[in-house]
From Swiss-Prot:
Gene: MGAT4A
Matching InterPro entries: Glyco_transf_54, MGAT4_A/B/C_C
Membrane topology per record: Single-pass type II membrane protein
High-level lineage: Eukaryota, Metazoa, Chordata, Craniata, Vertebrata
EC number(s) recorded for this UniProt protein: 2.4.1.145
Protein name (record): Alpha-1,3-mannosyl-glycoprotein 4-beta-N-acetylglucosaminyltransferase A
Record's keyword annotation contains S-adenosyl-L-methionine: no
Tissue-wise expression: Highly expressed in small intestine, kidney, lung and spleen. Weakly expressed in brain, heart and liver.
pH dependence as annotated: Optimum pH is 7.3.
Keyword 4Fe-4S among record annotations: no
Family stated for the protein in its record: Belongs to the glycosyltransferase 54 family.
Gene Ontology MF annotations: acetylglucosaminyltransferase activity; alanine-glyoxylate transaminase activity; alpha-1,3-mannosylglycoprotein 4-beta-N-acetylglucosaminyltransferase activity; metal ion binding; protein homodimerization activity
GO biological process: glyoxylate metabolic process; N-glycan processing; protein N-linked glycosylation
Length: 535
C-alpha cells in the first residue's frame, strides 16, 4: 500500500511539474511572439519612412532638373541657336516642366543648407563594428574631448559588465566620437579597440564619428539666455551630435536610450528597462526616463526619432536639448487655453518616469572647458517606495492634510507616494478625468515598506458614470448607487482595494475614495492603477 501511495505521489508530482513547465513554455513563447510582432511592425513603419524619404529626395532632384531646364529655356529665348540642339519632343517636355510651379516640402537641407556642399556630409567618417540590427535596445553614448579626464572606458565597463550573456545579444552600444580631429579620433578608436576588442568583434559595441562637413559654421551664433558665446557653441554642437547619433541608431533596434560618457549603472538595468517598456506597450508614451538628470537615461521608440531629429534641427541653435524635448511634448498635447497644471498632466502621459534611477552621473569635469559639475541623481540609491502605472489624465484633489510635500498629484503621475495625516469620516480623494474613460479595473495600494501600518481603513471606492440616467444596469449594481450619483463598487481590505468595473457603468467621469469612519493612523497611498479598457 505504501508503494502504491508513493507511486501515485510520484506520478502526481511528475504531472504537476510537466503542466508547470508546459505553462511556462507557452507563456514564454507568447511573450517572445509579442516582441517579434512589435519588431515586425516597427520595421514596417521604418520601411515606409524610408520610402517617403526617398520619394522626397526624388522630388527634390526632379525640382533641380526643372530649374536647369528653366535656365536652358531662358538661354534659348536670348539666342535661337541652342533650340536647334533639342528635338521637338524634348522642347515639349521642357515647356510642360517649366510651366508648372509645384510647392516644395522643406527638408533637413532647409535648416542645414551646408550639407548640400558635400555628398558625404551625413556619412560617418569612422565606422567600426559589425553593423548589428534587430535588437531590442540601442544605447547611444556621445563623447568629446575633455581637458582634464575622460570617463568613457569606465562608463563602457559599467554598461557591459552589468549585462547577462543573453542580454549582450539583444542590444548594441554605439559610441559617437563628436570630434573632427583625425588624430584624436584615431586615438580614441585605438584605445577602445584595445580595451573592448571582444565586444566590438561580437557586434555589441560600435564606434562612429561624423565628417567635418556635417557641422555648419559655429563661430557667429547668437548669444541667448545669458549664456556665453562658448557655452552657446557647446550646446549647439551638442544638439547636432545627438541628431547624428540618433539618425545612425534608428534602424538598429526597437528602442533607443540616450546615455552619456560619464555614468555608472545599476545591476539588472537592461532587463528592468526592457520589461518596463513592454509593460507600457499599449500606452502612447514618447519618453521613458530612467534618470532625472538632463538627457541621461531618456528612452524613445525608434520611429519617434524621426520627429525628434527634425524638431531639433529646426531649433538646434536656439535652446539646449532637454528644453527642446519639453517643447515637443508641449506642442503635441498642451492646450494654450488650459492652465499649466493641465499641461503637466497631459505631458505626464507621454513622459513617464521610472524610479529609482538606473543611471548615476559620476563625471566631475564637464566637456565644456573649465566647467565643474557636481551633479548626482538623488534617486539612484533610493529604494522603490511606490509602484508606477500610467493612469488616464485627471485632475486630482483631496480633503486630507498632506504631510511634507508627498502630494496626491505626484503619486498619480508616478513621482512619489501620497502621505496624509490621520483621515476622518467624510474625507475623500478624488480623481476627475479630463475626459470620460472606459475603465476595466482599479487598484489602490496603501502603506509602504518603510511605513506598513499607514494604510487606508474603512474607505470605499466609488465611480461617477458619465450618464446619470438611462443606464442599462443590473439590480445589484443599481443598489450601489449613492445620492450624489456615484456608485460604490469596492472597499479597502488590509490596505488594498482592487476590482473590476461593471462595463455598464462606462464611460467613467471620476473615481472617489471616501473615508466612512475616523482612522487611528496616518495614510500612505503608494500605488494607483486605473486601467483603461484596451481596444
Amino acid at each position: 500500500m505504501r508503494l502504491r501511495n508513493g507511486t501515485v505521489a510520484t506520478v502526481l508530482a511528475f504531472i504537476t511539474s510537466f503542466l508547470t513547465l508546459s505553462w511556462y513554455t507557452t507563456w514564454q513563447n507568447g511573450k517572445e511572439k509579442v516582441i517579434a510582432y512589435q519588431r515586425e511592425f516597427l520595421a514596417l513603419k521604418e520601411r515606409l519612412r524610408i520610402a517617403e524619404h526617398r520619394i522626397s529626395q526624388r522630388s527634390s532632384e526632379l525640382s533641380a532638373i526643372v530649374q536647369q531646364f528653366k535656365r536652358v529655356e531662358a538661354e534659348t529665348n536670348r539666342s535661337k541657336d541652342p533650340v536647334n540642339k533639342f528635338s521637338d519632343d524634348t522642347l515639349k517636355i521642357l515647356k510642360e516642366l517649366t510651366s508648372k510651379k509645384s510647392l516644395q516640402v522643406p527638408s533637413i537641407y532647409y535648416h542645414l543648407p551646408h550639407l548640400l556642399q558635400n555628398e558625404g556630409s551625413l556619412q560617418p567618417a569612422v565606422q567600426i563594428g559589425n553593423g548589428r540590427t534587430g535588437v531590442s535596445i540601442v544605447m547611444g553614448i556621445p563623447t568629446v574631448k575633455r581637458e582634464v579626464k575622460s570617463y568613457l572606458i569606465e562608463t563602457l565597463h559599467s554598461l557591459i559588465d552589468n549585462l547577462y550573456p543573453e542580454e549582450k545579444l539583444d542590444c548594441v552600444i554605439v559610441v559617437f566620437i563628436g570630434e573632427t580631429d583625425t588624430d584624436y579620433v584615431n586615438g580614441v578608436v585605438a584605445n577602445l579597440e584595445k580595451e573592448f576588442s571582444k565586444e566590438i568583434s561580437s557586434g555589441l559595441v560600435e564606434i562612429i564619428s561624423p565628417p567635418e562637413s556635417y557641422y555648419p559654421d559655429l563661430t557667429n551664433l547668437k548669444e541667448t539666455f545669458g549664456d556665453s558665446k562658448e557655452r552657446v557653441r557647446w550646446r549647439t554642437k551638442q544638439n547636432l551630435d545627438y541628431c547624428f547619433l540618433m539618425m545612425y541608431a534608428q534602424e538598429k533596434g526597437t528602442y533607443y536610450i540616450q546615455l552619456e560618457d560619464d555614468i555608472i549603472v545599476k545591476q539588472n538595468y537592461f532587463n528592468t528597462i526592457k520589461n518596463f517598456a513592454l509593460q507600457l506597450s499599449s500606452e502612447e508614451w514618447m519618453i521613458l526616463e530612467f534618470s532625472q538628470l538632463g538627457f541621461i537615461g531618456k528612452m524613445f521608440q525608434a520611429p519617434d526619432l524621426t520627429l525628434i531629429v527634425e524638431f531639433i534641427f529646426m531649433f538646434y541653435k536656439e535652446k539646449p536639448i532637454d528644453w527642446l524635448l519639453d517643447h515637443i511634448l508641449w506642442v503635441k498635447v498642451c492646450n494654450p487655453e488650459k492652465d499649466a497644471k493641465h499641461c503637466d498632466r497631459q505631458k505626464a502621459n507621454l513622459r513617464i518616469r521610472f524610479r529609482p534611477s538606473l543611471f548615476q552621473h559620476v563625471g566631475l569635469h564637464s566637456s565644456l572647458t573649465g566647467k565643474i559639475q557636481k551633479l548626482t541623481d538623488k534617486d539612484y540609491m533610493k529604494p522603490l517606495l511606490l509602484k508606477i502605472h500610467v493612469n488616464p489624465p485627471a485632475e486630482v484633489s483631496t480633503s486630507l492634510k498632506v504631510y511634507q510635500g508627498h502630494t496626491l498629484e505626484k503619486t498619480y503621475m508616478g513621482e512619489d507616494f501620497f502621505w496624509a495625516i490621520t483621515p476622518v469620516a467624510g474625507d475623500y480623494i478624488l480623481f476627475k478625468f479630463d475626459k470620460p474613460v472606459n475603465v476595466e479595473s482599479y487598484l489602490f495600494h496603501s502603506g509602504n515598506q518603510d511605513h506598513p501600518g499607514d494604510i487606508l481603513l474603512n474607505t470605499t471606492v466609488e465611480v461617477l458614470p458619465l450618464k446619470s440616467e438611462g443606464l442599462d444596469i443590473s439590480k445589484e449594481t443599481k443598489d450601489k448607487r449613492l445620492e450624489d450619483g456615484y456608485f460604490r463598487i469596492g472597499k479597502f481590505e488590509n490596505g488594498v482595494a482592487e476590482g473590476m468595473v461593471d462595463p455598464s457603468l462606462n464611460p467613467i467621469s471620476a473615481f472617489r475614495l471616501s473615508v466612512i469612519q475616523n482612522s487611528a493612523v496616518w495614510a500612505i497611498l503608494n500605488e494607483i492603477h486605473i486601467k483603461k479598457v484596451t481596444n
